[in-house]
């Protein structure tokens, strides 16, 4: 009797999809801290500068310096993409310009404040949704996140998963 050595079609499809997923998804690196002001953005910018020295194409999609001189210094030498201006209630705000990032298509884009709520009129309600769109275009994203933003989601996760500690 001859042994069938062909791959199972379903297994073959899973392998192909897994390989395609590797090729089409960017990678996410999160700089995580307990509270605002502990140096997440500073650390992210230092990491980005290191990558740039290694020849990696790194751009700034959105950074909030909060007026900190040390943080502003680390921006020097990095390409900063323009922000999108959005008017809301007769006041002009600036948000990250997703389209300029997608057109520029860097290897890595820096996106501060992952949990930020965008101004009404933006493409997405939350910045994390902006990040997902960027990742889906095979662009790697460095971002920052505070523990308090995760803590604020505990009740929602418990409710949606029918569990509670």
Residue ranges of model-derived segments:
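Conserved P-loop
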Residues: 25-103
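Charged, amphipathic alpha-helical linker segments immediately N-terminal to NTP-binding catalytic cores
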Residues: 1-6
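Internal gly/pro-rich beta-alpha loop/helix module
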Residues: 143-165
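Conserved nucleotide-binding/hydrolysis micro-motifs of P-loop NTPases
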Residues: 50, 64-69, 115-116, 141, ...
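Loop/turn-to-beta-strand initiation segments
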Residues: 57, 105-108, 134-143
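Pre-Walker A adenine-sensing motif
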Residues: 10-24, 31
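Conserved ATPase-coupling elements of RecA-like P-loop NTPase cores
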Residues: 113-128, 146, 152-155
């Amino acid at each position: 009797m001859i042994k069938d050595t062909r791959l199972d079609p379903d297994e073959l499809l899973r392998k192909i999809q897994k390989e395609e997923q590797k090729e089409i998804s960017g990678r996410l690196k999160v700089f995580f801290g307990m509270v605002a002001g502990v140096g997440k953005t500073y650390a992210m910018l230092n990491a980005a500068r290191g990558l740039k020295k290694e020849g990696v194409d790194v751009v700034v999609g959105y950074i909030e310096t909060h007026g900190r001189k040390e943080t502003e210094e680390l921006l020097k030498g990095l390409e900063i993409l323009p922000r999108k201006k959005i008017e809301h209630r007769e006041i002009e705000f600036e948000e990250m310009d997703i389209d300029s990032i997608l057109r520029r298509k860097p290897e890595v884009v820096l996106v501060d404040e992952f949990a930020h709520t965008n101004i009404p009129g933006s493409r997405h309600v939350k910045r994390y949704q902006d990040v997902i769109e960027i990742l889906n275009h095979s662009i790697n994203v460095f971002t920052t996140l505070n523990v308090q933003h995760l803590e604020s989601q505990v009740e929602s996760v418990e409710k949606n998963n029918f569990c509670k500690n």
